[in-house]
Amino acid sequence: MKTLLLTLVVVTIVCLDLGNSLICYVSREGQTQTCPEGMNLCEKYAVSYFHDGRYFFTYECTSTCHRGDRNVCCSTDLCNK
Protein backbone atom coordinates (compact mmCIF):
# COMPACT_ATOMS: atom_id res chain seq x y z
CA MET A 1 0.00 0.00 0.00
CA LYS A 2 2.86 2.38 0.82
CA THR A 3 4.41 1.66 -2.58
CA LEU A 4 1.18 2.51 -4.37
CA LEU A 5 0.81 5.75 -2.42
CA LEU A 6 4.42 6.73 -3.10
CA THR A 7 3.96 5.98 -6.81
CA LEU A 8 0.86 8.17 -6.97
CA VAL A 9 2.67 11.04 -5.25
CA VAL A 10 5.62 10.82 -7.66
CA VAL A 11 3.34 10.67 -10.72
CA THR A 12 1.37 13.68 -9.46
CA ILE A 13 4.52 15.74 -8.91
CA VAL A 14 5.89 14.86 -12.34
CA CYS A 15 2.60 15.66 -14.07
CA LEU A 16 2.24 19.00 -12.31
CA ASP A 17 5.81 19.97 -13.17
CA LEU A 18 5.47 19.02 -16.84
CA GLY A 19 2.20 20.88 -17.21
CA ASN A 20 3.54 24.27 -16.14
CA SER A 21 7.11 24.30 -17.45
CA LEU A 22 8.26 25.78 -20.74
CA ILE A 23 11.63 24.64 -22.08
CA CYS A 24 13.61 27.00 -24.32
CA TYR A 25 16.98 26.99 -26.03
CA VAL A 26 19.39 29.34 -24.26
CA SER A 27 22.45 28.95 -26.48
CA ARG A 28 23.43 28.43 -30.10
CA GLU A 29 25.03 25.13 -29.05
CA GLY A 30 21.64 23.71 -28.04
CA GLN A 31 21.65 24.12 -24.27
CA THR A 32 18.14 24.25 -22.84
CA GLN A 33 16.53 25.69 -19.73
CA THR A 34 13.24 25.18 -17.94
CA CYS A 35 11.84 28.70 -17.78
CA PRO A 36 11.14 30.29 -14.41
CA GLU A 37 7.62 31.21 -13.37
CA GLY A 38 6.33 34.21 -15.29
CA MET A 39 8.57 33.56 -18.29
CA ASN A 40 6.07 32.02 -20.70
CA LEU A 41 7.79 32.71 -24.04
CA CYS A 42 10.91 31.50 -25.83
CA GLU A 43 12.88 34.01 -27.86
CA LYS A 44 15.74 34.15 -30.34
CA TYR A 45 16.70 37.70 -31.22
CA ALA A 46 19.42 39.37 -33.26
CA VAL A 47 21.96 41.60 -31.53
CA SER A 48 24.32 43.79 -33.56
CA TYR A 49 27.42 45.20 -31.91
CA PHE A 50 29.23 45.53 -35.21
CA HIS A 51 29.09 48.47 -37.62
CA ASP A 52 29.34 46.32 -40.74
CA GLY A 53 25.88 44.68 -40.55
CA ARG A 54 26.97 41.51 -38.77
CA TYR A 55 24.93 40.25 -35.83
CA PHE A 56 24.60 37.29 -33.50
CA PHE A 57 21.58 35.67 -31.88
CA THR A 58 20.65 35.54 -28.21
CA TYR A 59 18.39 32.72 -26.98
CA GLU A 60 16.32 32.97 -23.79
CA CYS A 61 13.14 32.53 -21.79
CA THR A 62 11.23 35.79 -21.54
CA SER A 63 7.92 37.37 -20.63
CA THR A 64 8.04 39.85 -23.54
CA CYS A 65 9.82 39.62 -26.89
CA HIS A 66 11.98 42.03 -28.87
CA ARG A 67 10.60 43.24 -32.19
CA GLY A 68 12.54 42.57 -35.37
CA ASP A 69 12.51 40.77 -38.70
CA ARG A 70 15.17 38.23 -37.67
CA ASN A 71 13.65 37.49 -34.27
CA VAL A 72 11.64 34.45 -33.17
CA CYS A 73 9.07 34.65 -30.37
CA CYS A 74 7.07 31.52 -29.52
CA SER A 75 5.37 29.66 -26.67
CA THR A 76 5.98 25.93 -27.14
CA ASP A 77 8.88 23.78 -25.94
CA LEU A 78 12.12 24.22 -27.89
CA CYS A 79 10.53 26.47 -30.51
CA ASN A 80 13.28 29.12 -30.60
CA LYS A 81 15.95 27.18 -32.54
Swiss-Prot record:
Organism expressing this protein natively: Micrurus mipartitus (Red-tailed coral snake)
Q: What family does this belong to?
A: Belongs to the three-finger toxin family. Short-chain subfamily.
Keywords on this record?
Acetylcholine receptor inhibiting toxin, Disulfide bond, Ion channel impairing toxin, Neurotoxin, Postsynaptic neurotoxin, Secreted, Signal, Toxin
rRNA-binding in keyword set = no
Residue pairs linked by disulfide bridges in the UniProt entry: C24-C42, C35-C61, C65-C73, C74-C79
Annotated signal sequence range? 1-21
Q: In which tissues is it expressed?
A: Expressed by the venom gland.
Localization per record: Secreted
Q: Which GO terms describe its molecular function?
A: acetylcholine receptor inhibitor activity; ion channel regulator activity; toxin activity
Q: What is this protein called?
A: Mipartoxin-2
Q: What does this protein do?
A: Snake venom neurotoxin that blocks neuromuscular transmission, presenting a postsynaptic action through the nicotinic acetylcholine receptor (nAChR). Has no cytotoxic activity.
Main location group = secreted
- List the Gene3D superfamilies hit by this protein, alphabetically: CD59 (2.10.60.10)
Sorted alphabetically, the Gene Ontology cellular component annotations on this record are: extracellular region
